[in-house]
């Protein structure tokens, strides 16, 4: 049971496993209570909520139509004695709209933790997002690119702050300092060809089939390479079919999901480059943390905010 001694109420769509370090930091340094949704349309690994101090309740995300959903029992929290409310900046969450309206009436402050603007919004989406974000007291945005776009749309820059995005950096730094070259890939592939690497959920939006097609072209030109894919197919991509189509089975390692950070660090460290043909997301941060350069596309409206970490010709 919550005692409501905390002044900050955090209501998020879900608590992903990679957010555990930042949420734990928040719970130890800020007077926060946490409420997480139970599921998303696309499966993703959740953190163990019970291990987080000041975790109060899991809310049921009820999907109504398309991507729109309602978080059960979330609206009642606006009437509790919290001063601040930190919400995912998702216009698709209809209960968030109600919380924002009530917070205005009750003179409570609200903060969005959000991607913000992408640059590909239609006229209708622009109208909806402008109204939605205008209801917040402050906006915590992942990247400077989004802040720049939102400033041009008329948002007050003084109410926006760039918070970037990260993984468990402290732990990853310890691992990185102890990494050294290994034979992980030469042993598996029985060759010493350059290694392309991808980690993350295997989704259609990631366009991983482009890597397979590029590998075939390189092979025909006499420059064979290997590919390692770490992650679960959550979108019916069936990458194995594309691999078989180009007869590249001996050059592709479909590793599957992995949450052993020491193992992940070793794979990044020994790979030549990380490739994400679609939006790159946190994969870019993960890769650069271990010194592995990143290749992705430069159509920024269709990128994740983490693309800003890639410096052309230097880190990717």
What are these regions (language model features)?
Residues 266-282, 292-293, 299-300:
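Acidic donor-binding loop of glycosyltransferase active sites
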Residues 134-184, 191, 198:
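Donor nucleotide-sugar binding/catalytic pocket of nucleotide-sugar-dependent glycosyltransferases
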Residues 106-127, 135-138:
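A short, histidine- and acid-enriched strand-loop-helix "catalytic/donor-clamping" loop
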Residues 257, 265-271, 287:
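Short alpha-helical donor nucleotide-sugar binding micro-motif in glycosyltransferases
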Residues 23, 196, 211-212, 227:
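A structural motif in glycosyltransferase catalytic domains
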Residues 1-59, 80:
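N-terminal subdomain of nucleotide-sugar transferases
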Residues 230, 237-258:
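Nucleotide-activated donor-binding/catalytic signature segment of Leloir-type glycosyltransferases, i.e.
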Residues 9, 187-206, 212-215:
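Conserved donor-binding/catalytic core segment of Leloir-type glycosyltransferases
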